[in-house]
Amino acid sequence: MPSDSKKPTIIYPCLWDYRVIMTTKDTSTLKELLETYQRPFKLEFKNTSKNAKFYSFNVSMEVSNESERNEIFQKISQLDKVVQTL
């Protein structure tokens, strides 16, 4: 098996970035979700699509382990106005 197919080694806790694409500029539900983790986070507006149909944001926050990182990803992805989470 080639070495490039291995999972990268991530040392936790670490700062993790999520790119969130939404159909609204209103990030209140996203902020509410992130606040439930009771730790600092950074939420930055990044881009608007050409026709202003989508808005992208960058979320940075510390995650304790892979399970928590994946849980946050899933919860963000399930928000009503979220189209995609990367």
Swiss-Prot record:
Residues in coiled coil: none
One Pfam family in the UniProt entry: DUF493
InterPro entries: UPF0250_YbeD-like (IPR007454), YbeD-like_sf (IPR027471)
Top-level taxon in the UniProt lineage: Bacteria
Family, similarity comment: To C.jejuni CJ0253.
Protein name: Uncharacterized protein HP_0495
